[in-house]
């Protein structure tokens, strides 16, 4: 179809893809079960109390900046590939990457600058380092979203599944190492290391998916449009944003 084929994208098929996502999610959850209980050994109840304040605003900002966009990008890429509009699919990925990247920078900076205020409002001014540790993760998550959406739109679920596992491994290993190393120095630094584990995990997941993208260059040959198909490449930025 318009130069696009399942062989070109090495599609793994819906069933296999679903199994990969399920397996990745399961492994990620199993690893996560041990994270908090082990961290509690050096942190204690007081340290864990400082871990929680940054999480609520962090999750709220992620919900505003990126939740659902992974699915939206995936759906639109899949739709354009199905009709042979490879140029349109490429534009969806590029525009979403640009918009998400800009949004990620803005929200990360806002989160970092507001960190002392958010910590004071929640009654834990000593948790400010934890807020700062999470700020870069917002940008990295938004960058990762469009690439994961690209691969899921191509019915390639392995990158998404592997990303989940890599993120959780990084979170647990680096986070716990930081907790055990920094808690003896200062309790709030140990708590911040717990939060920083999340950022490191997201960073490793982003590195992996970027590596896969640079290795495969999946959009390299997305230069054609099937006869009779109106390409989304011709849509204005505003029109395409409304679709996303």
Predicted regions, residues:
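N-terminal membrane topogenesis motif
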Residues: 1-33, 91, 231-244
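Short membrane-interface helical motifs at transmembrane helix boundaries
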Residues: 106-128
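Alpha-helical transmembrane segments of multi-pass membrane proteins
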Residues: 124-147
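Membrane-interface junctions at transmembrane-helix termini in multi-pass inner-membrane proteins
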Residues: 142-163
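Membrane-interface helix-loop junctions in multi-pass transport and translocation proteins
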Residues: 157-158, 169-215
């Amino acid at each position: 179809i318009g130069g696009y084929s399942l062989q070109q994208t090495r599609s793994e098929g819906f069933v296999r893809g679903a199994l990969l996502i399920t397996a990745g999610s399961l492994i990620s959850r199993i690893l996560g079960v041990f994270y908090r209980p082990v961290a509690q050994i050096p942190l204690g109840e007081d340290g864990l109390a400082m871990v929680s304040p940054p999480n609520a605003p962090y999750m709220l900002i992620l919900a505003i900046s990126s939740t659902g966009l992974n699915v939206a990008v995936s759906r639109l890429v899949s739709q354009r590939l199905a009709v042979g509009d490879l140029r349109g699919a490429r534009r969806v990925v590029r525009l979403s990457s640009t918009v998400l990247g800009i949004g990620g920078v803005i929200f990360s900076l806002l989160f970092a600058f507001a960190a002392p205020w958010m910590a004071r409002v929640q009654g834990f001014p000593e948790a400010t380092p934890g807020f700062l540790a999470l700020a870069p993760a917002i940008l990295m998550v938004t960058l990762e979203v469009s690439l994961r959406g690209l691969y899921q739109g191509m019915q390639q679920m392995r990158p998404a599944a592997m990303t989940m596992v890599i993120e959780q491994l990084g979170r647990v290993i680096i986070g716990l190492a930081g907790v055990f190393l920094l808690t003896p120095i200062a309790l709030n630094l140990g708590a911040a290391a717990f939060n920083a584990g999340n950022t490191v995990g997201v960073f490793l997941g982003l590195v992996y998916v970027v590596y896969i993208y640079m290795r495969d260059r999946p959009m390299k040959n997305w230069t054609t449009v099937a006869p009779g198909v109106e390409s989304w490449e011709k849509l204005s930025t505003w029109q395409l944003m409304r679709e996303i």
